[in-house]
UniProtKB/Swiss-Prot annotation:
Gene Ontology terms, MF aspect: 4 iron, 4 sulfur cluster binding; 7,8-didemethyl-8-hydroxy-5-deazariboflavin synthase activity; iron ion binding; transferase activity, transferring alkyl or aryl (other than methyl) groups
Enzyme class, first EC level, given as a word: lyase
Pfam families (UniProt xref): Radical_SAM (PF04055)
CDD domains noted in UniProt: Radical_SAM
Cofactor details (free text): Binds 1 [4Fe-4S] cluster. The cluster is coordinated with 3 cysteines and an exchangeable S-adenosyl-L-methionine.
Primary gene name: cofG
Key words of the record: 4Fe-4S, Iron, Iron-sulfur, Lyase, Metal-binding, S-adenosyl-L-methionine
Keyword S-adenosyl-L-methionine belongs to the record: yes
Protein name as annotated: 7,8-didemethyl-8-hydroxy-5-deazariboflavin synthase
EC number(s) on file: 4.3.1.32
Subunit structure and binding partners: Consists of two subunits, CofG and CofH.
Essential cofactor(s): [4Fe-4S] cluster
Catalytic activities: 5-amino-5-(4-hydroxybenzyl)-6-(D-ribitylimino)-5,6-dihydrouracil + S-adenosyl-L-methionine = 7,8-didemethyl-8-hydroxy-5-deazariboflavin + 5'-deoxyadenosine + L-methionine + NH4(+) + H(+)
Residues that coordinate or bind [4Fe-4S] cluster: C31, C35, C38
Organism: Methanothrix thermoacetophila (strain DSM 6194 / JCM 14653 / NBRC 101360 / PT)
Length: 326
């Protein structure tokens, strides 16, 4: 699919971006938080846990579509609302094992996790993730104990101590100041300097949702996003990729400003966090040279920083550069 893009790109003007071909599997939409911009979370009487058979059907479609990543996402510490903690975590491990059997590398974003919980999941994941969102204490998070910055920083730090390749990022336009954005990026940079585990930082604009507190809010302007990506490129170590979601904003100006990754693009499932924002088709991104990667970045493929159970599949899927084998 990349060949058509490369034919469109011309000379030094071409922009280059990596991406991962994935399937997005929402494990559960039960969540202890009640963020003012979220339409993913469901109240306990409406929330559900995906069945193994449904997850397997999605993975089968992902196989057919040539995906290499299974993105597992769920609400924050749902067992504090309903259910058994160990039972859900063991089920998540079971889904990760199924993904590996089907040739898909798991990347799990399960919200706030303790070090013990990270240790349970890490062997079955090529990488993991948790958005920092902001170091500021914001009104929009006042009913969300899992969005306290110090709690999120602790999980990101614990992942670093365990050498888990990690994706994090900031959410832009949720009531934070420009200074807050810079401080958040500086904290991420410092965590990486300490542990070396941050593979990418997402700069994600708010997408206001009808029926939520964010409904009357305005997403950040493109000019502000371009400026922020440029600032992020100066603050973050060069080995950290800057990711921008291509279904939320035109990625081309942001790539020109210093972003270099488009994240997971799924030919199989919607973005369950922003389901009304469809993924672009790969060949719609004209003028961008797309390079397919795995959910674990080449640097960490070479370092061997990935879950022990993922090793054999990574060796099958990665080329000599650590990118997706074609």
């Amino acid at each position: 699919m990349c060949a058509g893009i490369q034919a469109e790109a011309r000379g030094a003007e071409a922009l280059r971006a990596t991406f991962s071909r994935n399937v997005f599997i929402p494990v559960t939409d039960l969540c202890r938080n009640a963020c003012g911009y979220c339409s993913f979370r469901r109240d306990p009487d409406r929330a559900r846990v995906i069945s193994r058979s449904e997850a397997q059907r999605l993975m089968e479609r992902a196989q057919s579509a040539g995906c290499s990543e299974a993105l597992f996402s769920m609400g924050d510490r749902p067992w504090e609302v309903r259910g058994d903690r160990l039972e859900l975590l063991e089920y998540l491990v079971e889904l990760c094992e199924l993904a590996l059997e089907m040739g898909l590398l798991p990347h799990t974003n399960a919200g706030i996790l303790t070090r013990e919980e990270l240790e349970l999941l890490a062997p079955y994941n090529a990488s993991m993730g948790l958005m920092l969102e902001s170091t500021a204490h914001l009104k929009i998070h006042e009913r969300s104990p899992g969005k306290r910055p110090e709690v999120r920083i602790r999980t990101i730090s614990d992942a670093g101590a365990l050498r888990i390749p990690f994706t994090t990022g900031i959410l832009v336009g949720i009531g934070e100041s420009s200074e807050d954005r810079i401080r958040s990026l500086e904290v991420i940079a410092e965590l990486h300097r300490r542990y070396g585990h941050i593979q990418e930082v997402i700069i994600q604009p708010l997408d206001p949702k009808p029926g939520t507190e964010s409904e009357g809010m305005h997403p950040p302007a493109m000019t502000d996003m371009v400026k922020l990506v440029s600032i992020a490129r100066r603050i973050l170590p060069l080995e950290i990729s800057i990711q921008v979601p291509p279904n939320l904003m035109d990625p081309v100006p942001l790539l020109r400003a210093g972003a270099d990754d488009l994240g997971g693009i799924s030919p199989v499932t919607p973005d369950w966090i922003n389901p009304e924002r469809r993924w672009p088709e790969i060949d719609e991104l004209r003028g961008v040279v797309l390079v397919e990667r795995l959910p674990v970045y080449p640097r960490y493929v070479k370092l061997g920083w990935y879950g022990s159970r993922t090793k054999d599949l990574i060796k099958r899927l990665a080329d000599e550069r650590g990118l997706r084998r074609t």
